[in-house]
């Protein structure tokens, strides 16, 4: 269970790296009184180089969220620009970056080459949310489109990395 950021929402996460060091990560933080910022990402590669690049991308994401920015598209372009500056290992980062409005249930999302989110309704029915998105970070400058979805009370937003889909296909 993630730290209790707000009583209006439950956050849970599971991270089981295939190796002792990996490139997947997630983060969530409160933005003001009524917003929750979140990210889930996967760095290409494995081992120490991926873990170091993951740490850098996580730091950039956390810094953007902690500055209480509420524009995922602008944050994505800034994170991508920073990652493009120092990428001697030619790595890339897939990411879903979003802001949840805790009052309205509106989720504003940006997808950088990441797995599409899934919404599970109160009856357990699932629907995959197809996002336009763009390429993974640190490949090319790109104007990442802002996408929106509305969560109803009791619905669950499920975010995964490709580790889940790879495990399902194994």
In which residue ranges do the predicted regions lie?
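Short, intrinsically disordered, charge-balanced linker/junction segments flanking boundaries
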Residues: 167-170
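… and, occasionally, acidic/histidine-rich disordered N-termini of signaling adaptors
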Residues: 1-158
């Amino acid at each position: 269970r993630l730290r209790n950021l707000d009583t209006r929402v439950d956050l849970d996460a599971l991270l089981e790296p295939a190796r002792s060091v990996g490139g997947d990560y997630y983060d969530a933080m409160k933005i003001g009184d009524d917003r929750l910022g979140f990210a889930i990402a996967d760095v290409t590669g494995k081992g120490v180089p991926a873990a170091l690049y993951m740490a850098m991308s996580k730091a950039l994401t956390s810094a953007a969220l902690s500055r209480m920015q509420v524009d995922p598209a602008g944050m994505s372009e800034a994170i991508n620009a920073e990652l493009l500056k120092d990428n001697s290992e030619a790595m890339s980062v897939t990411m879903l970056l979003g802001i949840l409005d805790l009052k309205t249930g509106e989720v504003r999302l940006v997808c950088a080459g990441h797995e599409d989110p899934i919404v599970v309704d109160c009856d357990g029915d699932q629907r995959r949310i197809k996002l336009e998105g763009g390429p993974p970070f640190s490949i090319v400058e790109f104007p990442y489109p802002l996408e929106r979805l509305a969560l109803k009370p009791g619905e669950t937003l499920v975010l995964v990395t490709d580790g889940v889909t790879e495990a399902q296909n194994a």
